[in-house]
């Protein structure tokens, strides 16, 4: 079977349409036969047989390498034994044997092109088209992005790294041009239990640069040599596997490769490493001399987190929080009539914070953040408990906390989907809906409340930056002056003043700026004359929101900026700065 389209639906699951994966054609569900005719005629793929031969050669080469490397390993058929939880909470078992070669295709690039007014149906259902005896399959779970479980991709390539021109037969007369897979991918998951030619390319490219993994290599500590090695791997992955890495994303992917090797080594030592995982492990045998990289622990709490949950060992905070959360079924039980009421849910978070105060002093935002962390840990732990893939297993204490969380619904049960009372749009999570209501309908307050002051924010990251800047010690010191900062990006921007770097250049006039934001303001205001902020009291318009706010202060005669040298007052900071210069000149 070959995936050729997606089934799209609206938010109420009342209307369904078919959308072609390779173009913008859509059709009604009842016209599926005409849709298949369109795919066969407009998007004939003539290199299908070539791809199957490449995959067979790739599989044979995998077997030969492993047999030569470790004859003690017993190899059975490929076992894609990962348990994947789909959106309906159903376990999907992916299997393949030596007779039915399978490979996965990434739907990320195709799905991104769908119309915003439509969504994938439940479970991300897709239409399948018969394509001969051989089988291809798209792993829909590859679109889920979680730590060590990022997008899973595939590409037209073999382990022999031959180009398409070397393998493709002459074009058949009378056939339309073959379809091409649109767009590049920017990341993919490294897994030893899924067949993915991109992983093979990565292993081969990484093996050719021992300065990145062999401590005894003479260039192991040579940063220029390591940078050149990263660039070479990025170039090769772009050319051979259609993956456009950044340096940071490449480093994360290589870390995944090391983690998979470490977990496979532990499994081999227990005598349980078989099938596809054993063959990938054999291809990575060169990593035996590399420093051991272990899986990262679950997300760590920092100083900004008020409720510090720890599932690795028994503790009062985690136990009390789970017990308190269980007392508020309106936050997790979809069967209750008040489950969808954003006002009642917000009040429940406040009451939960008040009830939890004898253990930890926290506000409703701290409770909401802790609830989200609990749910993320819960569903990840369930996956690790049920799965046979190469990931870290649950500890005994985690299993005990899992039993305490048995009151929570299964993942994918629409338990966190909430609807806006004003426009019927749906959102995942209370705070996403509350931000929408404030911005789109101008009702209520922004959800993220600072733990130390009354300020509110629309994003978690903005609240954390505010806490660091306003309520924590500034530990980052400038190497050129005595100033210190609480946020790393603030220090980097400040350092540009000392170094004189202005990396952002206007393409129209050549003027340079330290910040991308300043460049955008320059282009929009000077060259495009975009002035989106207009005064309600006069006809003036402004480029920036704060300029409008200062202008309105002038209308209202609000002069809150006062000179420290005299009694002069002003309604904006720029006027005060000009006035200060007059004092300095005197």
Curated annotation (Swiss-Prot):
One of its GO terms (cellular component) is nucleus. This is Madf and zinc finger protein 1. Possesses 2 MADF domains, the negatively charged MADF1 and the positively charged MADF2. Both MADF domains are essential for protein function. MADF2 is important for recruitment to heterochromatin and may mediate interaction with other proteins. Possesses a C-terminal cluster of 6 C2H2-type zinc fingers. This cluster of zinc fingers is essential for protein function and sufficient for recognition and binding of specific DNA motifs in chromatin. Residues 201-292, 320-413 bind DNA. Pfam families: MADF_DNA_bdg, zf-C2H2. It comes from Drosophila melanogaster. One of its GO terms (molecular function) is sequence-specific DNA binding. Interacts (via regions flanking MADF domain 1) with Cp190 (via regions between the BTB domain and first zinc finger domain); the interaction is probably direct and is essential for protein function. The lineage of its organism: Eukaryota, Metazoa, Ecdysozoa, Arthropoda, Hexapoda.
């Amino acid at each position: 079977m070959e995936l050729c389209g997606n089934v799209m639906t609206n938010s109420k699951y009342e209307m369904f349409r078919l959308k072609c994966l390779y173009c913008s054609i859509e059709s009604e569900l009842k016209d599926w036969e005409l849709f298949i005719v369109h795919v066969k005629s407009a998007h004939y793929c003539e290199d299908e047989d070539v791809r199957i031969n490449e995959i067979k050669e790739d599989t044979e080469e995998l077997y030969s390498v492993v047999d030569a490397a470790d004859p003690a390993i017993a190899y059975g058929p490929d076992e894609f034994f990962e348990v994947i939880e789909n959106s309906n909470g159903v376990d999907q078992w992916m299997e393949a044997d030596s007779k039915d070669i399978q490979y996965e295709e990434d739907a990320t690039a195709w799905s991104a092109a769908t119309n915003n007014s439509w969504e994938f149906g439940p479970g991300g259902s897709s239409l399948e088209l018969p394509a001969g005896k051989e089988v291809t399959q798209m792993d829909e779970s590859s679109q889920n992005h979680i730590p060590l479980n990022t997008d899973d991709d595939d590409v037209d390539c073999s382990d022999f790294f031959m180009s398409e021109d070397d393998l493709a037969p002459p074009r058949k007369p009378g056939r339309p041009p073959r379809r091409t897979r649109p767009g590049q991918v920017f990341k993919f998951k490294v897994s030893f239990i899924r067949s993915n030619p991109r992983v093979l390319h990565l292993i081969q490219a990484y093996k050719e640069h021992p300065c990145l993994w062999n401590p005894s290599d003479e260039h192991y500590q040579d940063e220029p040599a390591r940078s050149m090695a990263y660039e070479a791997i990025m170039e090769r992955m772009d050319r051979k596997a259609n993956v456009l890495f950044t340096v940071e994303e490449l480093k994360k992917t290589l870390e995944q490769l090391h983690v998979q090797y470490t977990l496979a080594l532990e499994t081999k030592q227990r005598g349980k490493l078989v099938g596809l995982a054993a063959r990938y492990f054999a291809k990575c045998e060169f990593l035996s001399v590399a420093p051991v990289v272990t899986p990262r622990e679950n997300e760590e709490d920092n100083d900004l987190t008020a409720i510090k949950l720890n599932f690795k060992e028994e503790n009062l905070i985690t136990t009390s929080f789970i017990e308190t959360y269980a007392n508020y079924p309106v936050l997790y039980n979809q069967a209750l009539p008040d489950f969808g009421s954003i006002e009642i849910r917000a009040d429940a978070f406040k009451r939960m914070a008040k009830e939890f105060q004898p253990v930890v002093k926290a506000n409703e935002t701290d409770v909401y953040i802790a609830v989200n962390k609990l749910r993320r840990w819960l569903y990840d732990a369930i996956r690790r408990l049920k799965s046979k893939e190469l990931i870290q297993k649950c500890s005994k204490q985690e299993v005990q906390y899992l039993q305490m969380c048995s009151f929570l619904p299964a993942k994918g049960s629409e338990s966190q989907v909430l609807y806006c009372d004003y426009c019927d749009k749906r959102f995942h999570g209370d705070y996403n809906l509350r931000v929408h209501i404030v911005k789109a309908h101008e009702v209520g307050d922004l959800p993220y409340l600072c733990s130390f002051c009354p300020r509110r924010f629309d994003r978690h990251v903005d609240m954390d930056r505010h806490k660091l800047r306003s309520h924590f010690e500034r530990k980052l010191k400038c190497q050129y002056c005595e100033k210190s900062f609480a946020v790393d990006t603030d220090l980097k921007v400040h350092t540009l003043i000392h170094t004189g770097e202005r990396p952002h250049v206007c393409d129209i006039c050549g003027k340079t700026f330290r910040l991308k934001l300043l460049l955008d303001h320059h282009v929009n205001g000077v060259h495009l004359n975009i002035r989106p902020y207009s005064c309600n009291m006069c006809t003036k318009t402004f480029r920036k929101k704060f300029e409008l706010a200062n202008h309105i202060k002038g209308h209202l005669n609000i002069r809150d900026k006062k000179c420290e040298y005299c009694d002069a007052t002003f309604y904006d900071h720029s006027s005060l700065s000009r006035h200060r210069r007059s004092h300095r000149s005197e």
